[in-house]
Amino acid sequence: MVGLRIAPPLALRRPTRLVQRNLLVYRRSFMVIFSGFFEPLFYLFSMGFGVGALIGDVPLGDGRSVPYAVFVAPALLASSAMNGAIYETSNNFFYKLKYAKLYDAIIATPMSLQDVARGEVMWALMRGSLYSIGFLGVVGLLALAGLGLISSPLGWLAFPAATVVGYAFAGAGMAATTFVRKWRDFDFMQLAIMPMFLFSGTFYPIDAYPAAVQTFVQLTPLYRGVHLIRACTTGSLDATLLIDLAYLVALGTIGLAITSRRLGKLLLS
């Protein structure tokens, strides 16, 4: 009896080849991929447990209060997913595009520009997911030690939520990188990333801001990611999470479309 092998659709098969290529490149230095994982982890221990011991409980939007570490942990998970996606779609993507001329060679094969964009987003999403898995692994170990940071049985939803965050920043980061001309232009990207990390409800509720500033913060992608993951880990689920999901998926998809068009202009003109 001949077994049937179901091949993935072409729209996924070709981008997967690019993911396989990246895996081969990193096979001897795989720990480099985890370089950005440690920053949010250090913040968790220093801010969540260190400063948290001085602060006490923090109010949530639904009237409940949780320990400061429980408040901060989901925000740092969102930041970890963001870091993994941004690291891969900024400097690494720029090097392959401008200096290694990797994509000039790839588009000489049956792969299209859309395949290139999808493949790099898939790879960035994989890196962001690895960061999230590592972070959640540490959270799990802390739970075994009696330092539980997830207060809801729905906390497992934090991982797929972090994956959506990674997708949003992968698409947006790669689209932004197609407009970068020189290495120093990445300083402008950091001017967006660092304030988002500090002020998007990561370390304290945005109720501390004036109403106009709160509205502005709510428009940022990291706030949407923080709000989504925090709702999963604390059990504060409501209809506003659909807005978070729609926002993040739309951002990633629009970024992917812009990247495909920009690659056409950069590589074919």
Q: Residue ranges of each PLM-predicted region?
A:
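Short amphipathic alpha-helical coupling elements at transmembrane boundaries
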Residues: 17, 21-25, 91-98, 104-108, ...
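Alpha-helical transmembrane segments and their short interhelical loops
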Residues: 113-190, 236-260
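Alpha-helical membrane-protein architecture signal
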Residues: 12, 16, 20, 27, ...
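Transmembrane helix-loop junction
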Residues: 52-53, 79, 95, 109, ...
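Transmembrane helix segments
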Residues: 177-219, 223
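Hydrophobic alpha-helical transmembrane segments of multi-pass membrane transport proteins
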Residues: 42-47, 68-142, 191-197
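Aromatic- and glycine-rich beta-strand/loop motifs that create alpha-glucan
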Residues: 2-39
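Transmembrane helix-boundary elements of multi-pass transport/secretion proteins
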Residues: 25-97, 128, 147-158, 208, ...
